[in-house]
From Swiss-Prot:
Keywords: Coiled coil, Endoplasmic reticulum, Leucine-rich repeat, Membrane, Microsome, Nucleus, Repeat, Signal-anchor, Transmembrane, Transmembrane helix. The gene is lrrc59. This is Leucine-rich repeat-containing protein 59. LRR repeats lie at residues 10-31, 40-61, 63-84, 86-107, 109-128. Gene3D superfamilies: Ribonuclease Inhibitor. Residues 170-187, 194-203, 218-237 have a biased composition (Basic and acidic residues). The lineage of its organism: Eukaryota, Metazoa, Chordata, Craniata, Vertebrata. It comes from the Eukaryota.
Length: 308
């Protein structure tokens, strides 16, 4: 703090009335904080230094009326330079300025401007003129202010155009978002409906299966199965075994009788009767037939067909 106060005091020593001369001071930056403490210095000379730029807070020195920045290496002015609303005289001779900030149009008090020996853009250089005398510098201030107002208008129109484009883009995005949300709602609704239909089908199928199961169960209860037949008693089992044996014996006897009859028929009515076996069979047949002649019915039935 003491050091800052010391610098401020040094600056005050250079103050002559309302003029503060800091030219040829080998400055590479503007001591803005020290200058703020000297609002009386409405005329500030910073010419012939090593300044390459002005800090943004330099624009807070709105009380400055006359500013000399000639013969430095300043490439551009702060974007808020237009806040120096009391500035009437501005010397920018021999710097490296190419263009002026848009806010320059707000310097409505500016009456005198020198932009000689700067690599200005052609349009700005044409408006600035030569600035060879007092009259031309005043004309320069007037022409440049008019030009910068036009630039400001173009800038504002471009800004409005960009804002409108951003607004339109935002509206399009919002519209697309609404469409997407509506599509998502429809999709969810359709999926929910499909899920509901699937659940209904599953429920109906389950009901049908349960109904069929109940019908089968009821039918099984009404028609006793093989497992529910009454268990036979020992007496019934014995009778069943006896009947089974009798059926087997009857089958064997019937089979034997059929074989015997077939043998008799074969030996009686085929060429086999000449064989020894058939002669024996025929002899037995004749003996049996003779023994049964006493029965008229059997005699007629067993009568030798050859004798008929």
């Amino acid at each position: 703090m003491a050091r800052a106060n010391g610098r401020s005091q040094n600056l005050r020593d250079k103050l002559d009335g309302n003029e503060l001369d800091l030219s040829l001071s080998d400055l590479s930056e503007v001591p803005v904080r020290d200058l703020v403490a000297i609002p009386k210095a409405t005329a500030l000379d910073l010419s012939c230094n090593k300044l390459t730029s002005l800090p943004d807070d330099f624009c807070n020195l709105s009380y400055i009326v006359r500013l000399d920045l000639s013969k430095n290496q300043i490439a551009q002015l702060p974007s808020e330079f237009g806040r120096l609303v009391n500035l009437q005289h501005l010397d920018l001779l021999q710097n490296r300025i190419v263009a002026l900030p848009v806010s320059f149009a707000q310097l409505k008090s500016l009456k005198w401007l020198d932009l000689k020996d700067n690599p200005l853009k052609p349009a700005l250089a044409k408006v600035a003129g030569d600035c060879l005398d007092e009259k031309q510098c005043k004309e320069c201030a007037q022409g440049v202010l008019q030009y910068m107002k036009s630039v400001q208008s173009d800038h504002e129109r471009e800004l409005q155009r960009k804002l409108q484009l951003d607004k339109d883009r935002k509206q399009r995005l919002e519209a697309q978002q609404r469409v997407k949300e509506e599509q998502d709602r429809e999709l969810r609704k359709r999926m929910k409906q499909q899920q509901k239909e699937r659940k209904r089908r599953d429920y109906n199928a389950m009901q049908e299966a349960q109904k069929a199961l109940n019908n089968n169960k009821k039918k099984a209860e009404e028609e006793p199965s093989e497992n529910h037949k009454p268990v036979p008693t020992p007496k019934e089992k014995k009778l069943a075994r006896r009947q089974s044996r009798l059926r087997k014996i009857a089958c064997i006897l019937l089979f034997g009788l059929m074989v015997a009859l077939l043998g008799v028929v074969a030996c009686r009515f085929t060429d086999l009767k000449t064989f020894e076996v058939c002669r024996s069979v025929n002899a037995v047949y004749k003996e049996t037939l003779s023994a049964l002649h006493s029965n008229p019915v059997l005699e007629r039935f067993l009568q030798d067909p050859s004798s008929q």
